Amino acid sequence: MRAVFVLIVLFASIAGAGLARAGDSMSYREMADTMQMDDTARFGKALFDRLEWRDGDTGEGRGVWDGQAWYGGDYDKLWVKSEGKYVSTGHDKGLRDADVELLWSRVISRWWNLQVGGRQDFGPGQSRTWVSVGVEGLAPQWFETEATFYASDEGRTAARLKAQYDLLLTQRLVLQPFAEANLYGHSDRQHQIGSGLSDLEVSIRLRYELRREFAPYIGVVWLRRFGGTADFVRAAGGAASDVELAVGLRVWL
């Protein structure tokens, strides 16, 4: 539980500092009015931040995706997000940890958006449906941050925390550190998930932007499972931690 507390405090501090900074500056609407921006225009974007193949210590090759698309105006947008993996070999073979979210997003400050909607999980066992509430935006030092809370009609709760940063080494070469943590309020034996901090992924990727919308990359990913989740994985013959090499594409339209 100490690890859970540290993670929550860390992400809360980042988000809180970002909101405080935003509160001391001009609001998004005031900025748009001052610059005479057309805030009624509608536009959209689709992005796969991570579309990759991984191979690690366990010898289990896997395809992984993390993408999102949105459409709307300056203040309100409709978002679709999805992430997951397909394991090609080993005890975990098949679709794993896959989900799709449909969200309404509203600007609440210069740097932050409130997002409300639902999430549908896919994969082995019973599918789960969640209601989601979260924030997404830029923390100090331009860290892209997401913090989302989930609740299901079965009384289950969960949280997902994400942070990433793009460091420009040159005009085309970009280094991107990334971290994601998943937490659950109750154990779920059917899905091999323990309560508390379930898993933590920390990675770093180096991409080369042939064009801004098309960038191949290589990376290293460290994945660690904790508590009951680690016990479930070990009991099934897997490893609680793994280091993987990643090769993939970042593409957007």
Region locations from a protein language model:
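Outer-membrane beta-barrel initiation region
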Residues: 20-93, 105-106, 245
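Extracellular loop and loop/strand-boundary signature of outer-membrane beta-barrel proteins
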Residues: 83-90, 120, 132, 147-149, ...
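Detector for outer-membrane/organellar transmembrane beta-barrel domains
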Residues: 127-189
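Outer-membrane beta-barrel "beta-signal"
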Residues: 204-209, 240-253
